[in-house]
């Protein structure tokens, strides 16, 4: 059934069910889902210890990340561009699925750059990107864990199929919760792009291994404003769901970034918790 006919004839819940079924079928047919059972070894491994999830937004320049050198730190994607990255030597490196819109060459460039620049003890990748990692023999002798994500309800159990991630910090948060970290501190996750219509990092975006076709040379979106706000709303809802889950489980998630839009978490200053 073509999408526009499907959406016109069927209620939203049934449409979502159809899309979820299609995505799960593809996930099982194209990937060895048994690989995610390895993640069971991570369950509550760091129970009661604190961690920091550090994003690549411009606000991360406001703090001295070397103050976290003796902490458990998650970074994501291209954080290796930070001038203090090697000295910080973060323990965890999280990567969501590379966009289907990317070519194989772009995916290879992205992953190769991470392989070259990052030597973290733990790497997390979407299982749908395993084929290219295997094909080009990337991350040899490195400790990889795969996440299986689809269009389903979030499980907060990375040894099972869980909900897909709209942004990298969502994956890092679910991993940290699964590993038993408490409290979990956030910084450098601004998520204010829809408000200011600028997609900036702490580094020059021209350094990115692959360019987002929806972002122009001035780091502004080519999409219409209503589309940006709709996407942002869906992303905020995902963070709100995590906040509710964490509150019910007595897990403290603290946002240390006053410039961030993540107001669903308690706010503190970075200097307060050192």
Task: Give the positions of each predicted feature.
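Metal-ion/cofactor- or nucleotide/acyl-coenzyme-handling active-site neighborhoods
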Residues: 1-274
